[in-house]
Amino acid sequence: MRTIIIALSLLYCLHGQSEVRLSPLFTDNMVMQQTTDAPIWGITNTKHAVSIITSWDKKTYNAMPDKDGHFITHVSTPKAGGPYSITISDGTPITIDNVLIGEVWLCSGQSNMDFPVKGWGQTKNCDEELKNADHYRIRLLHVNNTMRPHAQTEFEAVGGGWQLCSAETVAGFSAVGYFFGRDIELNENVPVGLIESAWGGTPVEAWISSEFLSTMSDFKKATQRIINMPDDIPTRKHFYDEEITSFEKQLKNIDDNSVINADETCNRYLLPGLLTQKEFADFDGIIWCYKTIGIPHSWQNKELKLRLGMIDDNDVTYFNGKVIGRMDGYAENRVYSINADFVKEGKATIAIRIMDIGGYAGIVGYKDHDICIELDAENSISLNGEWLIKKTIPLADIPELPRNPITDAKNVCMLYNAMINPLVPFSIKGVIWYQGEDNVNRAYQYRELLPLLIEDWRKQWNNRFPFYIAQLANYHPKQKEPGESKWAEFREAQHLTAKHKDNVGVACLIDIGDANDIHPANKQEVARRLALLARAYNYGEQIESSGPVYNNHVISGDKVILHFINTDKGLTTSDGKTPRGFAIAGLDHKFYWAETEIKGNTVILWSPKVKHPIAIRYAWADNPDCNLCNSKLLPTYPFRTDDWPGMTLGNIAY
């Protein structure tokens, strides 16, 4: 067990005037993992032993503080039950009340895990769900978002600590986490504690410790940068300002485009929106967007606001050649102030240098109002409409962009340091993980990153706990013909992790996504499928926990016979029609849609265009049209029988 160091600024327990101070992990309404030796730690100003009395067995445990007052002991927890209390005393006792013993699950990842029951996102039937959200045996602990360059032992929690599950407390809590916990509480008849530690728009490498991430050659430099980063914000800002100055000098040498006027190489496109046109479809790098407007006389020498909404991915924005703002990350709304000294009557040019680091680029804007420049709420000029746009420097030719170490949660290791490390070694049953949209463009690299994270966390906890992955759901417009797909490659990376790691599972979500929304609303089904894995593998239920999985195949002439496992009572389709989503290729490696037939636990494939088949793919698309499932209507996992190099092979930029 690692040494626990508790900072003096940890939350004061509000149960009296004791000198003992505890983490938000140890508050009223907490849940402790059943039948284990659970650690309890804190800090005291005294030099003598701290006593911990557990009401379930009336046993007293003693812990000697070290020279700095830090203490830790382990208490033996019974089978699920409660409520109980824990009394901790260094001379003045404090009591943690309404403690339940049950199952504790950590819920982590990016925005689809952070997606609330009702808040910035809204789940399916959210109002009805909130009406029925009072669950005495479900407790919630929500870690506040924060990032630090070095491992922390303290954190802040929403509401200060554990909260009873209610319409009020669960509204802003992870929907996937809540629905998962509800399924476990109902089916296993145990109290459930849920810890949410998630942050939207974050890559997996932000959640890995520097100890582990530094072992990957792709991240040695980035990890060392964070290790060298000062902790205090003013010094960190100075550090970053120097990095940006150096970066801009390097970039100017290769991209000397005017920031005032567009030129003849520009084309006209409508904004706001993503640039999905063929010219930009496969381009990552620098894209310039220009808009000329007329500033009225009444606005002269007055401060203005430029409201651009979200931009994909990073931007530097100019007004008449002057930098007025910059921001990294597509999930942030841009609102930039324009200095009154820059504002003159007449023509003015807004120039935006977008750095696209993956997927489509664009000025995404707002859902409910125009992008605009404004004097005040009553006086604004819409910027919706035609912009002059051109691409310049591909990403591969751009010097590495330093990430803002104060505001950019994509920085390596920083979320582990601030949002995971402080939870260790609190006893947990396992982890559910919904993350990956931010790593899609590096799917092959993810084959190494996700297993690394799992090993990292298991080592820190000294516990090979179960780890269940939510496979990315279908997203983007459907494609008419078979082709390559970064999202399919990413799902493959997730599936390979589950295949090759012990006590790891993956829930297939290929049928419950939304073509137009990266945050599908049906979080109940996401959670149900994750809970099926836990119920089958950790709680001993004899249930079908997943959909069909490709096992092997036989080629017979111009036909291919595919064999599947996890078929329950046999293969079927979700809509009762012939299986769709299968593509077949011959020696030329060109895929065609296949004719299909189900026979028991096999699917027979053929195509008149492929006389000598050598490879099969199923659901191999961002948003595939597929329908094969088992008798429980759980979908078949996407797969391919080939190992031909994919679109993301070799992508390491982050």
Describe each region flagged by the PLM.
Residues 94-164, 195-277, 347-417, 421-426:
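An acidic-aromatic loop/edge-strand motif
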Residues 81-91, 351-352, 614-620:
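Short, aromatic- and glycine-rich surface loops/edge beta-strands on solvent-exposed regions
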Residues 34-36, 281-284, 521, 525, ...:
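Surface beta-strand/loop "capping" patches
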Residues 19, 25-103, 358-360:
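Ser/Thr-rich low-complexity repeats and stalk/linker segments
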Residues 57-81, 310, 317-370:
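Beta-strand-rich ligand-recognition modules
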Residues 566-654:
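C-terminal beta-sandwich/jelly-roll accessory domains of carbohydrate-active enzymes
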Residues 24-28, 283-296, 333-336, 417:
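Short beta-strands within extracellular/lumenal beta-sheet-rich domains
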Residues 266-267, 293-321, 350-352:
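Aromatic-lined ligand-binding clefts that engage carbohydrates, nucleic acids, or primary amines
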